[in-house]
Amino acid sequence: THRQSSAASDVYKRQATPLEKQIIEAMYIFYDKDSISDPDERDRAYLKRMRELNSKYPDDPDIAALYAGSYMSIRRWDYWDKSGNPKGETVEVAQSLEHIIDKGISHPGVFHLHIHLIEASMQPERALLSANSLEETVPIVGHVVHMPSHIYLRVGEYQKAIDNNIRSQKADKQLDKLWGDMPLPNLGTYPLSHKL
């Protein structure tokens, strides 16, 4: 309920750093349906808040990833027109992610979202560094291992795409074995790296 989530966020905010407090406040906008009743308006408010935080903390990889995610959840695979021109805030979001990548920071969220943002562009090679770097960040997660194939396919590196997908299935099976009999959590996406 609204009261419970508000009370929980108050507890965490008392123990949080100033940046963490701002993230909690942004998450409250996004996750608490009672904060703003209209889902589209709530998504726009969350994007606005993450845009502000990204401007304030441009070197923070978590903020960059959350900003990208807030934008991408609104645009939903509609980042480029048929001529390859960016739509909406695509350029700003790409610059935010690429700023973190250029600093040499290894961050699975930044790499993952960069791949998704750039894959349908006319320059998918812009995300090759993300594709080449993502797997090593969380190699036990099949979806993370699979993701580079989105770029490898677009740039004609077909064998690398095949190899990543084979490894992603092995990672899924390894995780499934480690997980045991407990049901996997429903994270609102495909199971593991698309299927076991």
Describe every region a protein language model picked out.
Residues S35-R51:
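Asp-box/WD-like beta-propeller blade repeats and closely related beta-sheet repeat scaffolds
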Residues K13-R14, M50, Y57, L97, ...:
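Alpha-helical junction/boundary sensor with strong preference for TPR arrays
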